A protein has these predicted regions:
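Short, contiguous strand/loop micro-motifs
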Residues: 33, 115-116
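Non-catalytic, surface-exposed connector residues within folded enzymatic/regulatory domains
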Residues: 79-82, 97-98, 151
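Acetyl-CoA-dependent GNAT
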Residues: 7-14, 18-93, 103-110
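Extreme N-terminal starter segment of soluble prokaryotic enzymes
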Residues: 2-4
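Conserved beta-strand termini and adjacent loop/short-helix elements that scaffold enzyme active sites
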Residues: 6-8, 140-142
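Conserved glycine-rich acetyl-CoA-binding loop
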Residues: 87-105, 122-130, 134
């Protein structure tokens, strides 16, 4: 298996990223989020995000198949000059193969002009928390509540690049 990390460029890549987003979201959150909220994350909604922000995404390709992606950019809280990893998803069949690490490293390189790169993670997403801690992200104490059919807590985690 040779996985390439690259920018999304073609309509086929955008559509494939949408499908990965939809499938990987289900795998990642079916046990963490209420079913009624899960039903709102449709393939059409994933297409919307893929088409709206293609320049802020890198995809992982195995052969001709998109198997993961990362979305990143400026931190969405405009009062803080920092980068943000907005989304990271890899197909379940590709877990444990180093693809997520490659995607994160590529995004951190793209965001290396920031001294801090933030992301939000669900408090109960133990798999994601363990992964990011292995990648040297640390919790900074910030939390927020989301209303996703029931209250869900997110915690902010940060990577210090300088």
């Amino acid at each position: 298996m040779t996985v390439i990390i690259k920018s999304m460029e073609t309509p086929v890549e955008i559509e494939s990223k949408s499908l990965v987003h939809w499938k990987a979201w289900r795998d990642a959150y079916d046990d963490l989020l209420p079913a009624e909220f899960q039903e709102t994350m449709t393939l059409e909604r994933c297409r919307f995000f893929s088409q709206k922000y293609p320049e802020n995404a890198l995809i992982a390709i195995d052969g001709m198949k998109v198997v993961g992606f990362i979305s990143y950019g400026n931190f969405r809280d405009e009062t803080i000059q920092a980068g943000e990893i907005i989304a990271l998803y890899v197909l379940k069949d590709y877990y444990g193969k180093g693809i997520a690490q490659k995607l994160v490293r590529a995004a951190l390189t793209a965001l290396n002009h920031f001294s801090e790169i933030f992301l939000w993670v669900l408090k109960d997403n133990k798999r994601a928390i363990a992964f990011y801690q292995k990648m040297v992200f640390t919790f900074d104490g910030q939390e927020k509540m989301l209303e996703l059919g029931k209250p869900i807590k997110e915690k902010r985690i940060v990577f210090y690049s300088k």
